[in-house]
Amino acid sequence: MLELWGVLSLTSLGVMVIFLFSKIKSSFAESVKYAGYMNAVLLSILLMSDESEMLFLKWEWVKLGGYSLMISFRFDLYTCCFFVVGLYVTWNILMFSFYYMSTDPRIDLFCKYLGLFLIAMLLLVSAESLFQLLIGWEGVGIMSYLLISWWYARSDANTAALQAIFYNRVGDIGLLIMLMWSLVTLGDWSFTGLYALDFVNTFFLLGVVLAAAGKSAQLGLHPWLPAAMEGPTPVSSLLHSSTMVVAGVFLLIRFSPIILNHKEIQLMVFFLGTMTTLFSAICALAQNDMKKVVAFSTASQLGLMVTAVGAGAPQLAFLHICMHAFFKAMLFMCSGSFIHGLQNEQDVRKMGGLYSAAPITSVCFFIGSAALMGVPFLAGFFSKDPIIEIININNLNSWAVGLVLIATSFTAAYSVRLLYFSVGGVSRMLVLQPMNEEYGNLIGPLQRLAYSSVIAGVVFIYFLSPNQISCLSLPLSLKLAAVFVTLVGGLIAWDVVNLLHREESVTNIPELAFEAQVGFYPLIMHKLIPKVWLNMGEMYQMQVMDRGWTELALPQGLGGNYKIMADNVVNAQTSLIKMYIAVMVMMGGLILGIMICL
C-alpha cells in the first residue's frame, strides 16, 4: 500500500511542478484544480490505509572519495499525512490568491512562489537524511524572504523579511551543528543511522533544539513571526498553517525518539514550549492589529506543539499540526477578506458589525476561532485536549500544567475579543460598505476549510490515533479541565469587552504596556542593545582598546614604511653629474677589486 502512497505523493509533487512552470493562465488554473483532485485521491487512500511500514526511495547522487551522498525519501505516516494536509491547504490558499491578488501585475510569479514554498516544505518533510532536510530547510527560508518582501516598495515589508532571515540564521547554526556532528561521528547523514545509535551527544541535541526554536519562533527567537504579517495575506496563511513555522516542530518530532532518551533535553523542550505558549497568548490579548492577533495565536499553538513533544507525545504534536493547518489558514483568509473589503484597515477597534456586511466570511471566521479555542467536536478539540491531558499526567514538572491551562484560557479570551470587535457589535466605521462575497475564489476556499475544521478532527482521530496513542483514563475533573478553562476565559473576555464598551472613557492601564509591547523584547533587542554597543564603540575606539598597535601595524605602519622607502629613492636622484660619476667609479672599483681577489 505504501508503494502506492509513494507514487501518488510524487505524482502530486509533479503536478505542482507542472503548474509552477506553466506560462498560460488557463493551464495554470487547470493544474491547480488537478492538484486539488489529487489530494482527494490521497485522502481516500489515507482513509483506507492502516499500515505503518515505511517506504524508502534511495539512489546515489554524488560520490566523493569513499563517501557517497545518497538521495532518499522517507514515506511514513507523518510524511503521507502531511502531504495530504499541505497540498489540500495550499490548493485553497492558491485559489484564494486569485481573488486577493487579482490586481497584482505579478500574480503568476506570486502563485509560483507559493508553490515552490510548499515543494520546499514537502522536501523537508519527506527527507531521510540531514542533507536533504537542509535543502528543504533553506528552501522554505529563502521563499519566506521573497514572499514576505513581496511588496518591496514598503520599508516595513523589507525590514520584516530581513528580520525573518536573521532570526532563522540563528536557528540554522543548530542545523549546521547537527550536520557536522553527524558526519564526524557517524560518517553518514541518514536518519536511520542516527536512530540506530546507542548514544547521541548532547551537543547534537542542543543543535536540534536551537534549529527548532529558530524556525518555529520559540521564546527568544519569536519577534520575526508577528513582523512577517507585513507580507500579503496568502503568504501569512501559508506560512502559518502548513509550511515554515511548523518545520521546527516537525524536526523535533523526527528526532523525538532520541530526545525522549535524554531527560535534560526533554525537560528543556518542555520548558521552552510551555513558556512560549503562555508568553504568546499574553501578547495576543493586547494586540489591535487583526493579523497580529492571529499571528500570536500561531506562536502560542506552536509552543503547545513543542510542549507535547517534551511531554513525550510527538504523535499528538503532529496531530495538532494537521488540525491547526485547517483553521489557521481559514482565519488568515477571513482576516484578509475583511481587510480587503475595508480598504486595508487592520485595526480591530475600527471594525465591528461585519456580520451584516460579510455573513459567509463572518461565519467561517467564527468557526475558525471556535476551533482555535478548542470548542468540543471541532478540529482543535481533538488535538488540544489530548495534549493537555498528557501534560496533566506527565511527571516532568507540575507547574507546567497550570501555565498551559492559563494559556488555554487566554486563547479563549483573545479569540472572543477578536470576534467581538470585528464580527459582533455595531460598526465603528463612518460608512460600512457591503462586501462582495460572490467571488468563487473567495467563498470556495473558505467553505472547504470551514468544513474541514468541523470534520477533520473526527477523521484524523479515528483513522490515525488508535494505533499510535493509547487511551487515557483520567478523573472527570482533569478530562474537563481544558473545556472549563476555555469557557471561563471566553466568559471573562466577553464581560470585559462589554464593560469597556459601556464606559465613556477608558483610562490606559499600565499593565497592558507589557502585552502591547510584546514583553519589550523588540525594544530591548532591536533598539536598546544595538544603541548601547554603538555608543560603547564610539567611546572606546580601537586605539583605546589595543593602544594603537593594530592600526600602527597595518594601515599606518605599511603606509609609513612605503613612504620612507620612496623618500630614500627620491633623495638618491639629485640630478648631480659629479655624484653620478663618483658612484660609477666607486662601483667600478669595487667590481674590479672583487675580480682581482678571485
UniProtKB/Swiss-Prot annotation:
Organism for this UniProt entry: Branchiostoma lanceolatum
NCBIfam families linked to this entry: NDH_I_L
Protein name as annotated: NADH-ubiquinone oxidoreductase chain 5
The gene coding this protein: ND5
GO biological process, one term: electron transport coupled proton transport
Keywords, in A-Z order: Electron transport, Membrane, Mitochondrion, Mitochondrion inner membrane, NAD, Respiratory chain, Translocase, Transmembrane, Transmembrane helix, Transport, Ubiquinone
Transmembrane region(s): 1-21, 28-48, 81-101, 115-135, 171-191, 193-213, 233-253, 265-285, 293-312, 323-343, 362-382, 399-421, 454-474, 480-500, 509-529, 576-596
An MF annotation (GO) of this entry: NADH dehydrogenase (ubiquinone) activity
InterPro entries: NADH_DH_su5_C, NADHpl_OxRdtase_5_subgr, ND/Mrp_TM, NU5C-like, Proton_antipo_N
Domain of life: Eukaryota
Protein purpose: Core subunit of the mitochondrial membrane respiratory chain NADH dehydrogenase (Complex I) that is believed to belong to the minimal assembly required for catalysis. Complex I functions in the transfer of electrons from NADH to the respiratory chain. The immediate electron acceptor for the enzyme is believed to be ubiquinone.
Organism classification: Eukaryota, Metazoa, Chordata, Cephalochordata, Leptocardii
Catalytic activity annotation: a ubiquinone + NADH + 5 H(+)(in) = a ubiquinol + NAD(+) + 4 H(+)(out)
